[in-house]
Amino acid sequence: MYQDLDDPIEVIAVFSDHQLRPVRFKWNNRVHKVSRVTGSWKKLEGEYIIRYFAVVDEETNVFQLTYNERLTDWVLSKVWVE
């Protein structure tokens, strides 16, 4: 099941071919390298877009990262816990 969070994170992301893709992020003083993005979607909030990314790190942990274009910030919004 997922645990809902709203933790600010630092993200290194690549923007190419009109696509934004997170590459790694820092959460709780630990760097997680994204091994794959399993899904991405966006939601319009007023005039701004909120982008969501379901990602898996190198240790097969599953996270949902959220990028707010208006605030230009990232948060860790969900983490898979067993």
What are these model-derived regions, one by one?
Residues 1-82:
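Cysteine-centric segments in proteins
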